Amino acid sequence: MPLPKIQDIQDFTDKEIEEKIIKLKKEIFDLKLKQATRQNVRSHLFKHKKHQLAQLLTIKKDSNYV
């Protein structure tokens, strides 16, 4: 599964971006919790979720300056 491109999320509204940020933070927390309790975790998802979160935060920051 390739990492998502920033072009895929640039057209989102501010509300959609906020919702996705909250959702991704929850997913990252859940992954960390699973890892801490030694449940089966696909470790590559950490990188993907953090990458998506960074993209969303960048888009959010850029839209605040416009």
Curated annotation (Swiss-Prot):
Main localization (coarse): plastid
Organism: Gracilaria tenuistipitata var. liui (Red alga)
Gene3D superfamilies: 1.10.287.310
Transmembrane segments: none
One cellular-component annotation, GO: chloroplast
HAMAP family for this protein: Ribosomal_uL29
GO function term, MF aspect, one: structural constituent of ribosome
Highest taxon listed in the record's lineage: Eukaryota
Cross-referenced InterPro entries: Ribosomal_protein_uL29 (IPR050063), Ribosomal_uL29 (IPR001854), Ribosomal_uL29_sf (IPR036049)
GO biological process: translation
Subcellular location: Plastid, Chloroplast
Lineage of the species this protein comes from: Eukaryota, Rhodophyta, Florideophyceae, Rhodymeniophycidae, Gracilariales
Entry keyword set: Chloroplast, Plastid, Ribonucleoprotein, Ribosomal protein
Family: Belongs to the universal ribosomal protein uL29 family.
Pfam family, one: Ribosomal_L29
UniProt name for this protein: Large ribosomal subunit protein uL29c
